[in-house]
Amino acid sequence: MTHKLTPMMQQWHQCKEQAGDCLLLFRLGEFYEAFFDDALILAQNLDITLTQRQNVPMSGIPATCLDGYVDRLVSRGFKVAIAEQADNTEGSKGLVPRTINRLITPGALLSSSLLPEKANNYVLAINQVGSLYGLSCLDLSIGTFLVAEYDNTKDLIEAICRLAPTELLSHAKFYQKNAAVIKQLQQHLRITLSEYVSWAFEYQSATKKLYTCFQVSSLDGFGLQGLVPAINAAGALLSYIQDKLLLPISHLSIPKIYGQQKHLLIDKASQTNLELLSPIHGEHGKGSLLQVMERTSTPMGGRLLRNTLINPFYDLKEITLRQDSVEFFLQQEDLRKILKRQLSCVRDLERLATKISTSLATPKDIGTLRDSLLSCTHIADNLQNCALPEFLENKFLIAPPLCSLIKTLSTELIQELPLKVSEGNIFANHYHPDLLRLRNIKENSKSWILEYQERIRNETGIKKLKVCYAQALGYYIEVASNLAPQLPKEFIRRQSRLHAERFTTQELQQFQDEVFSVEDKLQTLETKLFKELCFYIVEHRDLILKLSTAVADLDYVVSLAELAAEYDYRRPLVDHSDALSITKGMHPVALTLLDKGTFIPNDTVMHSAQTRMILLTGPNMAGKSTYIRQIALLVIMAQMGSFIPARSAHIGIVDKIFTRIGAGDNLSKGMSTFMVEMAETANILHNATDRSLVILDEIGRGTSTYDGLAIAQAVVEFLLFTDGKKAKTLFATHYKELTELEMHCQHVENFHAMVKENSGQPIFMYEIVKGHSKKSFGIHVAKLAGFPLSVVSRAQQILHQFEGPDLRPEPEKAQQLVMF
């Protein structure tokens, strides 16, 4: 810029320097303005007008619409800084001071319409010390604070993908050194990258921040001793939140080590392949296991269900406790319905507690908390005389201090609370001795106005004279213009209108001063009382959060009981055996999408001492993929403590589930279909154990027939004969040669998707039966897909030629394909 900057633009540049990579919204009167590149971004993303002044691009949004526009920007991954102007007292001259008082980023949301109701919203910091990686993540909206440490990038990436943060924080050197890790994360997650000063990630700075935040002199009590990279990440994250984003951190829970409790591990690829949270194709959520299982009534219960779905239990005790509770509520139908109704009245206790702790709560939020806590007492009343299962014992014994708080909120507040403190009418008259007195004065003012209006009408003889109020004028007397000369001299003219004149009197002015004084006093008093009430609630925050956890647990098991009742699910036997036996099992998602009674159930029997691997053959569209996915989903549900869609089941606890299903190019990685397939299969071979469940669909199909067959057989042999890798495996394949493995290994059993023929046309039965498939019916599927009839006919001719004796492999060579 060649021209001299105005004082206001100098001020903008100072704020922009502080905002860094954030889009700066700069308050100018009743608008928030953006300049230069920020103006272009604002105009492009919000569809607002871009203008120029002195060759400076600018665009703006009304101050009254700020929150909605900011949410739109943040939802697109932008970080936004808000520069507010200080109150300018009347008559003051010069430039109004402006400072940044808020920075909003995708991961650091305390209260926003962007917060997913039944999912966490994490900001995650990552750091490296030597070969160790430390991470720390926060959900500011509920105060959850997690840390972890990993010695390899694979486990690090898997952990971050499970947490699914919306914002990632580190320093420049880490981003440069670990570009490959960041690239992988960006391929799996929609994530905003944020950069922070490197010194905040140093041990001395990080520990000091943690000590200050939690008012301790040692981190050993949190179990963090020796976890230097994790401590560095945690301290830097706190510094970023408090010092950079200017957000409160006093409400955070003490840091907990993520993954300390062992879970059934489901890697990101398997979560996607099994469509746990969202379908691979179609609308978001619909067709996923989460959508089928989601019967929760509270946000806390919904978050618990989602987290448990991708982190099922490995501890048998945890599984059994929840199964017992599901069974209890399945049998108690009337109680279940009552609890469902009462749970639906409980709002997000965790996020309400956070809003109150961070001074962001409105009176309406306090009313929501009150109503939710009252609903919790009704739930407790309904449970107190029940012989509850162990999982829920004593969880709804509401502590006396919390009972006292609930009583205060129930008796001392007005039922319908306002959105803003400034609107008043928050507390009952008896809450404070001055409330009733001031309210009476304010209320009596209405009758005084009516009496005064009637009196001066009689005195002046003007029957249409009115006493009115306007924000700009205050109280005034209005008469028609032609009647104004009839008013006495003590009437003081205030304003002339087209057909009316407005006046005041000394008496009316004196009344106005008294009323305004009362209103100011009343607002000041209620504001003070509201702050004191919020502080009183914050003192009970831990008890509220404990009750919130109890509500989430109850909601979780009641919702699973509701699901079991709706679809006639049965309780699986889960134990430490290596059994996998399912009678009349059904795919939980497909079951809900088909007409009742049309889904064909199938059995599964696997045992390490007998069948460890099922080789599944059959044509496309016959149900192979549905069947093998079904087994994995039923195991996941069982280890969540849920009942499952089966007549009966015996499931030995599984430690990991791996899937290799389908294939697709990953152009962003520069990986072909076959490379993706091989990379995912390699991951399975390296990480599967004897207690794992492996689902493989069409391994080796992305290369030549014999290459693919050789790879497929080598994978089968590895999983059958390598100590520590003998996972239960379901392998769907079109390679008929592999079915001969059954003759060479007692742990392999052939099954196929049954097809009947009618006049040469296949009829898919969707039954999985013993033996291998004789035909693939691929040409029939091509015909169903709409191939031109000439192409179908030619394919049949070529197939007959291939099946002729001249093109069949020699017996010796064919036999070599199945030799170990």
Curated annotation (Swiss-Prot):
InterPro entries xrefs: DNA_mismatch_repair_MutS (IPR005748), DNA_mismatch_repair_MutS-lik_N (IPR007695), DNA_mismatch_repair_MutS/MSH (IPR017261), DNA_mismatch_repair_MutS_C (IPR000432), DNA_mismatch_repair_MutS_clamp (IPR007861), DNA_mismatch_repair_MutS_core (IPR007696), DNA_mismatch_repair_MutS_N (IPR016151), DNA_mismatch_repair_MutS_sf (IPR036187)
Keywords: ATP-binding, DNA damage, DNA repair, DNA-binding, Nucleotide-binding
Binding of ATP, residues: G618, P619, N620, M621, A622, G623, K624, S625
GO cellular component, one term: cytosol
SUPFAM superfamilies: DNA repair protein MutS, domain I (SSF55271), DNA repair protein MutS, domain II (SSF53150), DNA repair protein MutS, domain III (SSF48334), P-loop containing nucleoside triphosphate hydrolases (SSF52540)
Pfam families given in the database record: MutS_I, MutS_II, MutS_III, MutS_IV, MutS_V
Domain of life: Bacteria
Cleaved signal peptide residues: none
Gene Ontology biological-process annotations: mismatch repair
UniProt-listed Gene3D superfamilies: 1.10.1420.10, DNA repair protein MutS, domain I, MutS, connector domain, P-loop containing nucleotide triphosphate hydrolases
GO molecular function: ATP binding; ATP-dependent DNA damage sensor activity; damaged DNA binding; mismatched DNA binding
CDD domains reported in the protein's UniProt record: ABC_MutS1
Family: Belongs to the DNA mismatch repair MutS family.
PANTHER family registered for this protein in UniProt: DNA MISMATCH REPAIR PROTEIN MSH1, MITOCHONDRIAL, DNA MISMATCH REPAIR PROTEIN MUTS FAMILY MEMBER
NCBIfam families, alphabetized: mutS1, PRK05399.1
Function (record text): This protein is involved in the repair of mismatches in DNA. It is possible that it carries out the mismatch recognition step. This protein has a weak ATPase activity.
Protein name from the UniProt record: DNA mismatch repair protein MutS
Organism: Chlamydia trachomatis serovar L2 (strain ATCC VR-902B / DSM 19102 / 434/Bu)
Name of the encoding gene: mutS
